[in-house]
């Protein structure tokens, strides 16, 4: 089992992940992968044994080096990323990114659709291409925090 998770806190997202589930951020039309896969292929890319293109074409994409449930404990990679208004955060299982290219993900996230429609389109596209694995997709869009208008806010403004 793999995991990608996020917690919004103080104008930031705290991202955690294990395995090859991913987190992406779309900001002003640019998609950024926020996580690094815990996989044999990623390790081979990192040390220069294969290229990212060779990894994408490999039949060994699902050999993870870290997963939930294998050992009693597992190391969760955690990082903090800033959040701006209108940023979109995508959490997904490898069933999505194995079948849909990052450029296509960015195009769908940038489309003028509801978040639910974007999720449906991403899952649908992965399934159209064979959907060999389970496909989990969550999209969150950042908004401006509400203005504080209570009594304490009025006192603190003085």
Roles of regions detected by a PLM:
Residues 21-23, 31-32, 40, 97:
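Short, surface-exposed beta-strand-loop junctions and turns on beta-sheet-rich folds
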Residues 3-5, 12-14, 52-55, 78-80, ...:
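A generic local secondary-structure boundary/capping motif
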Residues 1-26, 33:
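Conserved catalytic micro-motifs used in adenylation/nucleotidyl-transfer and phosphoryl/amide-
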Residues 17-22, 63-72, 82-108, 123-129, ...:
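Conserved beta-strand-loop-short alpha-helix elements that form
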Residues 136-158:
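Activation on terminal intrinsically disordered regulatory regions flanking enzyme cores
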Residues 110-118:
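Short, charged, surface-exposed loops that flank catalytic or proteolytic processing sites
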Residues 36-85, 148, 154:
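Conserved, helical-rich catalytic subdomain that frames metal- and/or nucleotide-binding sites
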Residues 28-30, 102-105, 151-152:
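Short amphipathic alpha-helical segments
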